């Protein structure tokens, strides 16, 4: 464990770095405006990962918990229909590229894991992805396991899968309605059996299944 004083110093440094980065972003946006480029500039601000500051007994990233995977994402472009709007929809970093190429009127490649966020940006409360995915490895007793995690609107489910065997050796399920900090694993609680099975099925179906459902929904909305 990190001593209390050292932990406070680390948190202080982390918050200071955020403030510094925020000021730099402000300088960039001010320069864009001063150059008269607001009307043809797309701004995207996001992080590649979250960060633990002593939470879950750890520091930095390197896990599948919400703090490490849930990141900020802000997008600004000219003539937005709903500027400053927020959404609680589930989105992924792989959605950024499809969004940018649509804004640039570039035809997308045949297969993309992500989906353009423009329909969601224009209508922030609309239905969107049922689930999003991430993964991170760890060694347990010299065995390499891949943590395959699925986030839905109210739950996070993680299956720890043997890299060599493909077998699931452990499961985690967190109920975000009652446990936003993911402190209690309810995977073995019989009351959550239906949700456990549903999320395991989503994991096996994977991102292609979610993309197909989203594409179908968007197509129906455009009719």
Language-model regions, residue ranges each:
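Active-site rim elements
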Residues: 3-17, 60, 81-91, 103-108, ...
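Generic structural marker for isolated residues within well-ordered, non-membrane alpha-helices
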Residues: 97, 183, 203
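C-terminal cap/loop subdomain of S1 sulfatases and analogous C-terminal strand-loop tails that border
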Residues: 49-55, 81, 94-97, 102-176, ...
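Histidine-centered active-site microenvironments of extracellular/periplasmic hydrolases
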Residues: 30-85, 89-92
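Beta-strand elements within well-structured catalytic alpha/beta cores of enzymes
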Residues: 14, 18-21, 25, 42-47, ...
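Secondary-structure boundary motif
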Residues: 34-37, 123-126, 188
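A long, amphipathic alpha-helix that forms part
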Residues: 1-41, 195-198, 205-207, 221
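Long, internal low-complexity/basic segments
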Residues: 1-2, 17, 169, 178, ...
